Amino acid sequence: MAGPVKDREAFQRLNFLYQAAHCVLAQDPENQALARFYCYTERTIAKRLVLRRDPSVKRTLCRGCSSLLVPGLTCTQRQRRCRGQRWTVQTCLTCQRSQRFLNDPGHLLWGDRPEAQLGSQADSKPLQPLPNTAHSISDRLPEEKMQTQGSSNQ
């Protein structure tokens, strides 16, 4: 289990604003302006406090107008094929900005990979310091000093 989270209150506030935007759209789909305001506020708080948001949250917010992207309500989702790869294209219905996401079932986001987790990093063995190969003259043994001085006199 991870230790105490820095800026816990800020993350709770971001979570509340994100959930409030979802609730507003679920209750009244016509009230997109209030949901957009909640998402914009969440985005500005995260920027001001330099907090990293989860990629799944970032994918559901429009980067242009800060609208909550709900397929069929505030955005359209299309499956496209380009150069043999399949892409999901989300287009915001408010500002017409589109985002493309690669459809790769084997793709894992960095945060979902095992090496990104703090617990697995703590379990790995600690790094050993490298031996210092560059010795100064003062680090040499007295016999070595005598040998070098004797060879220089010859």
UniProtKB/Swiss-Prot annotation:
Q: Which UniProt keywords apply?
A: Acetylation, Metal-binding, Nucleus, RNA-binding, tRNA processing, Zinc
Report any one BP term from Gene Ontology.
response to xenobiotic stimulus
> Where does it sit, as one GO cellular component term?
nucleolar ribonuclease P complex
Enumerate the Pfam families for this protein: Rpr2
Q: Where in the cell is it found?
A: Nucleus, Nucleolus
Could you tell me one molecular function GO term of this UniProt entry?
Answer: ribonuclease P RNA binding
Positions of modified residues (N-acetylalanine) = A2
| Keyword Ribonucleoprotein assigned | no
Where does this protein have compositionally biased stretches of type Basic and acidic residues? 137-146
Where is Zn(2+) bound in this sequence? C62, C65, C92, C95
Q: Which residues form a coiled coil?
A: none
Q: Where is the segment annotated Disordered?
A: 117-154
Subunit structure and binding partners:
RNase P consists of a catalytic RNA moiety and about 10 protein subunits; POP1, POP4, POP5, POP7, RPP14, RPP21, RPP25, RPP30, RPP38 and RPP40. Within the RNase P complex, POP1, POP7 and RPP25 form the 'finger' subcomplex, POP5, RPP14, RPP40 and homodimeric RPP30 form the 'palm' subcomplex, and RPP21, POP4 and RPP38 form the 'wrist' subcomplex. All subunits of the RNase P complex interact with the catalytic RNA.
What this chain does, per the entry, is described as: Component of ribonuclease P, a ribonucleoprotein complex that generates mature tRNA molecules by cleaving their 5'-ends.
Q: Which family does it belong to?
A: Belongs to the eukaryotic/archaeal RNase P protein component 4 family.
The name on file for this protein is Ribonuclease P protein subunit p21
Organism of origin is Homo sapiens
